[in-house]
Design a protein with these regions (language model features):
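Local sequence-structure signature of Cys/Sec-based thiol-disulfide redox active-site neighborhoods
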Residues: 5-67
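Thiol-based oxidoreductase modules, predominantly thioredoxin-like and allied folds used
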Residues: 9-10, 37, 62-89
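Non-catalytic, surface beta->alpha helical segment in thiol-disulfide oxidoreductase systems
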Residues: 96-152
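Short, internal strand/loop/helix patches
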Residues: 89-97
């Protein structure tokens, strides 16, 4: 509960900086499944009703997740006011991160490369995304998929 209270105090800019720091620390040739969701409004629940629904699927996925070759990360995008703001100073996730227009969104990264994404993910979507890793690895190893080296090194 203390962690949730600390998140509430962070602005969207602070949260975006945390995401940027995490993204820059991804090691080469590693897989990360990032979940972007609304910050808690009051208490433990997000202001975003779709995020609350998706959290059940994400929770089930986390239980089955152990032993997979992908790291699960969760990122908050700020308050409802910050997310829905139409002002010049838009939410940094919308302004600086391509195509993050909805929450919740799940994005599969190979190092810093955005490989696959799903809006309002369900457990089957998350399992599918992680299953794609084997296919991507096979394509990379066979030379059929040429990932820009700047993303994986």
């Amino acid at each position: 509960m203390q962690q949730e209270k600390e998140i509430e105090k962070l602005t969207a800019d602070d949260l975006f900086q945390q995401f940027q720091d995490s993204l820059s620390s991804f090691a080469p040739n590693t897989w990360h499944l990032a979940i972007f969701e609304g910050s808690p409004a009051e208490g433990l629940y997000s202001w975003c009703p779709d995020c609350v629904v998706a959290s059940t699927h994400i929770g089930h996925f986390e239980e089955e997740f152990k032993g997979r070759n992908v790291k699960l990360l969760k990122f908050k995008v700020g308050s409802k006011e910050e997310w829905e703001s139409n002002s010049v100073q838009k939410n940094p996730f919308k302004q600086n991160f391509p195509y993050l227009s909805d929450v919740p969104t799940a994005i599969l990264f190979l190092s810093r490369l955005d490989v696959c994404r799903v809006i309002a993910p369900q457990e089957t979507d998350l399992n599918y995304m992680c299953g794609r890793i084997d296919s991507y690895v096979e394509q990379i190893e066979s030379g059929q998929w040429h990932v820009p080296l700047r993303f994986i090194r």
